[in-house]
């Protein structure tokens, strides 16, 4: 009853609402990793840009590091297979690109900022019009489209319409030698001669190639390949004097343009004489004075038909066959300054992108700056280390440089696009810069370090734990084997193992399950599937120590426990010898291995490097280990005494006879009470109006209740309200939270050391750390605990504070189970607040983290909030003195910067919530991950600055920003060359409609205002409600569901302006779009909106004077008449202005402009 009397409590003020908008904003920013299921590749040698299309309809353009553009195709007939990008063709030098989808639809894309927008679309119907090849003219005005029917169509890129003449295959057949009597088949390749722009070289499917002359509209020369069957394609040299023609039987030959006779080596099969597979792509260039042929495929069909290879053959006899572990999608070769000198080979594979130096006869690999294969080995866990200090970051870089010594030093050839000038940072900022490092654990036992501070996801180090496990006979140097050329017999292709993708693991027990990393010291702890915990660091010690090994048994012979799972991993015996060489892994010192028995998977870990302690949990209990002295501290078994089986299968539970009998009596009593007359019953208040879902208490004997879910080291108030003590907190699946008090001996220093009288120092005795159980909490609902965090009065987590800092008292502990949050006071453990997520939202908590949020606001707003007692969650970490009664305070040194720490949580539905602490009031709720994406939900991890990363596919990472102060997104742009004749078309339209255009401009200028938030408003107030109620979509995406509405405003207009169009233009000229990535891309429109205007006219005949108008005489009998007219107009896709809202202290984004063009439907 009290909650009804109190009502809803104190509501946040208007200032708080404004502050929430300034602090919290959800948006998808950048994408990292390798595109999922790539299907097409294209390279622009003029602007030096690379484009990749995927089977899911994604289109990505890459230039120099930092220049990334995203686009997304949309569904036509609700079939996902139609999104498959089959061909890509650049309009060279303009920045535009053409894509052909499986729906046989041709789309022209144009970059606007960091987004690719589809500006023109052309569908092809009919089987004979199935597009098989594309070729853009050197003059950038035409596109030649080859079809499977054997015809070539010309597409005018300005109007995006088919124009005459069409090169029909029957016309070509009439002009070829009579010896060729076959149907030529589909168009496989079209090439324009660089020295004769009026001539086309066309390769048909069935061994016919013709040189077509547009001036005479005839076949100038025909080339017939005898006995080769199907042709695949051709490539023309830079001089236009010869071309290389390759075929489906694995052969190729170089023909002269001026000589239709076949060359002498027309039957050359590089991997013959056995039948070979098709050559899918071929390039020809030069290395010094030698010719170099690069081709994919062509392997002997019977012996090596399953190999995925790209071969590099030089005329001096040097041959290399790059053997990859995934399918070759396509490749291209970059050349030096429009010459035949080959520089870099870029290969797009199904699972990775590889590049090689063609100027070096050894064909060394090149380390690409982006598109790295995150899933080279399957990713098994993620860990994001925030605020890594500069010294640790440099240590990791030094270790990584030792692994990169075998890569080529040639510069990356794809350097297109431009970056803003403000990206350059000063040396002073770099000295104090903090880094974000993503650590990914893999199935093969490796841990990869990725620098994710900026837009680029850069691999900086690869730590392998597999080198310390196994027998000596199994061990080999994998790194040397990967980079060496493994030559086979003389008659076979010279294979070389290439690429990093390796989906197979020698031993599944090596898989990494948990990672702990200290951002201030560089201490690394890796937990594996077989209970192994590897301890390593990046500290360069003068004295190296050999590898140590120790095991800790959690169950021993407890109740006859039998482990039915896999065996533990064996450490290599030669590493454990007393005189063994210290174990290092390319710059990292591996100090020891802790084996937890039974060898179950590590479920959670905690690290406190300053104390020298690490704790690990399994399904059977937890261990505490002193890794500095390499001695165990204690272990605790969490198994229920009734557990009689091992964890190799689900833990079985026995129900006691007493409990079974009690439940039987309860069911009996319940059955009697429900046999009364139900028709006379009146529903109670609780039955009539359920307030929330009930959180049912779970049985204590639920399976896997002994699993330790989370561990936490913290120095807080446990036994005394005045003194902090080091503690270890653990929680299980059965909602049991245990608090262990740690006794750390004082560190011995040189000042406290007392020398002996004899002068001989006694042997150093290692410090002993002890632990004892101090308190235990049992949550009633018994839901698994997913996280524990202790924070001070300002809401800052004590485990994120610097060494020696305890935070401002009092401390509070947040315990997050799968169903609810609960806040307790310390040391009394008195409940303060709780938030029932499952009862209110129907979701379960998967992950929690504390993030810091900041924004710039006016000092007046800060002063008003300070005087009005803001919520306790508001706080500032400035240098000003804080009021002990009010958490929110003013920063004296930076009065316009406001800071706040909040709780971030992820649910199993893929939603991310931001809650204030300790009030647990919701500040933001965003649908971040699709609820069906289980891998994405389980892989998501947060940073301390309000960002998140998750696996959007097996190879890609999606970046999310929750804070307005920290947004990492691509800022590079691609210059766009305007289409020719655009200006002349506009001038003609302006000249024809000068009066109407002038009137339109006058009225638009009257009603166009700039609101304080920076959004351009061009609609009249009387019609704002119409635009607000209309539901607008962008490629099937409902704009109203966007989290960032009104961040972008797109103003559109029509090319041909008439009086009616001016009237419709005044009704609604502004369409507001959302900020979206991947599936949601800004402004991908084919139709902006369909507007319907209704005009109502009422005629009262009595008020009309007696004027001799014949048209009105017919209305005399009707007296009062009301007439309603309806008119509709479709505004076609053209974007003239995109203005981004300047909010939350972000830099103002430039306004890209494009010229108006109508789309063809």
Swiss-Prot record:
Impact noted for substituting residue 660 to A: In 3A; loss of phosphorylation. In the presence of aPKC remains localized to the cell cortex and does not display any decrease in phospholipid binding
Compartments it resides in: Cytoplasm, Cell cortex; Cytoplasm
Any one GO CC term of the record: cytoplasm
Keywords: Cell cycle, Cytoplasm, Developmental protein, Exocytosis, Phosphoprotein, Repeat, Tumor suppressor, WD repeat
Family: Belongs to the WD repeat L(2)GL family.
Consequence of substituting residue 664 to D: In 3D; phosphomimetic mutant that displays a slight decrease in phospholipid binding and reduced cortical localization
Protein's UniProt name: Lethal(2) giant larvae protein
Natural source organism: Drosophila melanogaster (Fruit fly)
WD repeat ranges, renumbered to this chain: 39-72, 82-128, 131-167, 189-223, 231-263, 278-320, 328-358, 380-464, 513-594, 603-664, 708-778, 787-832, 837-927, 941-964
Tissue: Expressed in the epithelial cells of the digestive tract and in gonads.
